[in-house]
Amino acid sequence: MALSLRACILLLKEHHLLKSAAIQNTEDVDMTGIAYDSRKVSGPTLFFCKGDKFRPIYLSMAKDNGARTYVAEKPYVEGNGLNALIVRNITKAMAILSAAFFDYPQDDLFVIAYTGTKGKTTASYFTEAILNEARPRHIALFSTIDTVVGPEPDQRFKSNLTTPESLDLFRDMREAVENGMTHLVMEVSSQAYLRNRVFGLTYDVGFFLNITPDHIGPNEHPTFANYLHNKLQLLVNARKVVINAETEHFDQVYAAATTTTYPESIYLFASAGFRPKRDDIDIDFRFDSQEADVAESRFTLVPVTEKAAALNIGGHYSLALIGDFNESNATAAIIGAGLAGVDASAAVPGIAKVKIPGRMEHTKVAGHGAVYVDYAHNYASMKALLSFLKHAYKDPRLLVVVGSPGDKGVSRRPGFAKVLTEFATEAFLTTDDPGYEDPANIIEEIDSKIDHSKVKVHKVLDRKKAIAEAISDSGPNDIVVVAGKGADPYQKVRGVNTPWPTDMAVVKQVAKSLQEG
């Protein structure tokens, strides 16, 4: 891979990003490397000065390591002797130049992208499974949990971000193409658009699953309007669009889709009993829940319109991943696979046995009922989870272990208090990625909004201890829910990813201790 200095200048001019260029000589320069981390510079490299934590010394280090050209929003004396491309927006520039450096790998992939407040990961895993049933060893996945760039075990690794930085995104795409991948299923976060990680990227199919207030705070989206706006950008940049017609703010969502996509390329889905508030749209697919219990979920997918029927994906489906709320995610995945040319003959078996790390994982503890570990980390996902369990287990006592991250998602905290008041019998408030905040203060913030006449609250900073106390306090007919972290193998504490054995590993340790003691 390489990119010439001349090509960089032309691309930046084309996108109206170039403010000025300081070129050291008239000869064109080929950059054979690209980086925003000075430690990853080796040889003639295009280096980006980006991020709130960028320091000029990083540019000096990049220069010492062989960088030839730097891109920044202002000149740096540390860059004297290097070609300097001064741009209006560094994150947009990095996205545009990274795509070019890796030779536009998205053009060699069928890209299916999901956005939504909840369900992105589940829908993505369902889609990957269906596509793998039809085209084994050819499906890439970029999710909150895993990144898959090839068919071999060492080509599957843990993700750092839901949607990676643009340079990493296009590098991973190129690696996937080189490894023979033909399709990519990816999650796209609102932060990805806010920070221009997917700037210039067009998807073959874009999904809008739902929207509720989340990720609103000083370090994220300033307002809900900004959060929604960034979510909608996925639809504006998709060739075909699929929308959950039951989403809040549907009119705005549908309007965004129609700005760049013809109605015949927009597909709507909803549950069997849903009736839209407007009569100028048609629901293309309906899913009818047959049974959702603690063993499996079964539903029927019914194509309603002619264009829906043409995909040949209607039929009866079962899910090993329990929870009636997952039927909506499964419907989205089946439609996505259908738009990629995969019909029900692969979708039915492909989706049936899917299990997702940290999603509805459960185990029985002798004498203490069932324990569920789930990534549910906002009001909407917690409500869906607790409502399902309350119904499936015939109104059990619910003991919930939960915390809220520091430095972000401040709007989640009153949501946790609300959902605990609505559903929990006992709440064990604990630590969950506190970052630079004091976890005790976060716990107090949640606790202050809980109705203590309805919920018994325990404040336990040590997450292991909180899980142990919740399980120990539970009876044989009770349900313990450990929410928020799912399969995360670390706690984010003061800028450090501190190893964490995962919630389920802790649950199993506690269960073993109880059985032995």
From Swiss-Prot:
Q: What class of enzyme is it?
A: ligase
Enumerate the Gene3D superfamilies for this protein.
Answer: Mur ligase, C-terminal domain, Mur-like, catalytic domain, MurE/MurF, N-terminal domain
Record's subcellular location: Cytoplasm
Q: In which pathway does it act?
A: Cell wall biogenesis; peptidoglycan biosynthesis
Q: Which Pfam families match?
A: Mur_ligase_C (PF02875), Mur_ligase_M (PF08245)
What does the UniProt record tell us about how this protein is modified after translation? Carboxylation is probably crucial for Mg(2+) binding and, consequently, for the gamma-phosphate positioning of ATP.
Q: What UniProt keywords apply to this chain's record, in alphabetical order? A: ATP-binding, Cell cycle, Cell division, Cell shape, Cell wall biogenesis/degradation, Cytoplasm, Ligase, Nucleotide-binding, Peptidoglycan synthesis
Protein known as? UDP-N-acetylmuramyl-tripeptide synthetase
Source species, please? Lacticaseibacillus paracasei (strain ATCC 334 / BCRC 17002 / CCUG 31169 / CIP 107868 / KCTC 3260 / NRRL B-441) (Lactobacillus paracasei)
User: Gene for this protein?
Assistant: murE
